[in-house]
């Protein structure tokens, strides 16, 4: 195999315009075995450097991706070697902390996800004695995790100084921004394998454990907390309990180098009596709250009683529509069959997340808008109009768009 690759390198070096028409067959058992041996050698070297503590994580390359609000979200690109070691540390931390995390935590955990978190919130507001919601948002959570507090939390259960040394190395590894090195004095870089687990450990100690041991015990009535990464929502039976928690939450966050985003944090009245209470006070419709891309609101049951429901949040609805519209206009010159085939994959992905109980109306509204975008995109493929509306409908009979369905029941 080495001889063949050397011959390719020789041709590439000596030819003015080399062209290689037969390469795929070179990826055979011999080459893969050779690569495997090199990998084993690299792993052995990595293990040795970990043992003698000469291992040093590389600074994470930081890039920025746009957010829905127009701001930029920092994302870290970690080296392959560091990813391997981080994954090993992550597995060790999960073995320690997964049994200790509270059931109200859903982010970045095995066999838990957004739907389970949304379902738990719905169960509390529909079957519990919940009348008030505290919807809070932490300002730049991942960027402001305090390293010293993080290490103190870890030291409560981890007494191995070598593991603690390695985790601190990752926290202090620094970042590269446009080729310039920057220290990381606080925060955990998003993008690494270890970052979500460290974030969960921080939230466990700062928020969820505190809520269970202090807030719930001091509350006069029923209350709950559901947390997904840095998103969380709390509900209370009595307003006084909600006010106490909201005030204490600000101080609690400040103690651990965190701050609530005031413009996105609020206490609202939310329950089966909210509508009549607000009406008696001369106020408008009951307020709603968003959690993980869904809006929780009060509608009517089949018998006409107030009943909590869930729908796609307006912000996420419009953001996804914009993404679909841009994709359609970028791919409008493909054959209709190919466009619809790829579009259906994207639609089903959308339905799988937003296809929850009560949300079928918003799913159909989304499909209707996408269908309009598809019609307009396919009529901009040239100077002449490609389809009349009737012709477009006939085309969809041949290549139908995926229909919405409910994938997750909240009952």
Predicted regions and their residues:
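Non-catalytic, polymerase-adjacent accessory regions of viral genome-replication enzymes
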Residues: 1-41
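Conserved polymerase palm-domain catalytic core
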Residues: 49-63, 68, 100-105, 109-112, ...
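A conserved non-catalytic segment of reverse transcriptases
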Residues: 172, 260-334
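Extended C-terminal regions of large enzymes
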Residues: 370-373, 378, 382-411
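Duplex nucleic acid-engaging cores and interfaces of nucleic-acid transaction enzymes
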Residues: 2-3, 15, 81-90, 122, ...
């Amino acid at each position: 195999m080495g001889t063949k690759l050397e011959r390719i390198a020789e041709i590439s070096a000596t030819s003015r315009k080399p062209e290689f028409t037969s390469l795929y067959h070179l990826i055979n058992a011999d080459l893969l075995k050779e690569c495997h041996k090199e990998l084993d050698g690299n792993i052995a070297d990595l293990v040795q450097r970990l043992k003698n503590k000469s291992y040093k994580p590389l600074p994470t390359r930081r890039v920025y991706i746009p957010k829905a609000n127009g701001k930029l979200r920092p994302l870290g690109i970690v080296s392959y070697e560091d990813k391997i070691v981080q994954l090993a540390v992550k597995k060790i931390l999960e073995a320690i902390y997964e049994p200790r995390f509270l059931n109200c935590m859903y982010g970045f955990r095995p066999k838990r996800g957004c739907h389970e978190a949304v379902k738990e919130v719905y169960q509390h507001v529909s079957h519990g004695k919940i009348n008030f919601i505290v919807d809070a948002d932490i300002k730049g959570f991942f960027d402001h995790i305090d390293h010293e507090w993080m290490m103190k939390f870890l030291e409560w259960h981890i007494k191995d100084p070598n593991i603690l040394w390695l985790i601190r190395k990752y926290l202090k590894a620094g970042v590269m921004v446009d080729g310039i090195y920057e220290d990381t004095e606080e925060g955990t870089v998003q993008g690494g394998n270890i970052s979500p687990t460290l974030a969960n450990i921080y939230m466990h100690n700062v928020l969820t454990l505190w809520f269970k041991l202090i807030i719930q015990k001091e509350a006069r009535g029923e209350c709950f907390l559901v947390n997904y990464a840095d998103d969380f929502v709390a509900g209370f039976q009595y307003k006084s309990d909600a006010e106490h928690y909201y005030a204490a939450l600000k101080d609690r966050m400040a103690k651990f180098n965190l701050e609530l985003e005031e413009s996105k944090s609020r206490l609202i009245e939310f329950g089966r009596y909210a509508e009549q209470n607000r009406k008696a006070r001369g106020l408008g419709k009951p307020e709603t709250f968003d959690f993980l891309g869904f809006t929780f609101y009060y509608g009517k049951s089949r018998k006409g009683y107030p009943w909590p429901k869930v729908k796609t949040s307006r912000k996420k609805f419009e953001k996804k529509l914009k993404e679909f519209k841009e994709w359609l206009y970028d791919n409008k010159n493909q054959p209709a069959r190919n466009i619809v085939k790829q579009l259906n994959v994207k639609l089903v992905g959308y339905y799988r997340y937003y296809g929850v109980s009560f949300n079928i109306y918003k799913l159909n509204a989304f499909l209707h808008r996408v269908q309009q975008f598809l019609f307009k995109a396919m009529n901009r493929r040239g100077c002449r109009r490609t389809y009349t509306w009737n012709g477009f409908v006939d085309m969809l009979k041949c290549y139908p768009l995926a229909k919405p369905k409910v994938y997750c029941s909240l009952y």
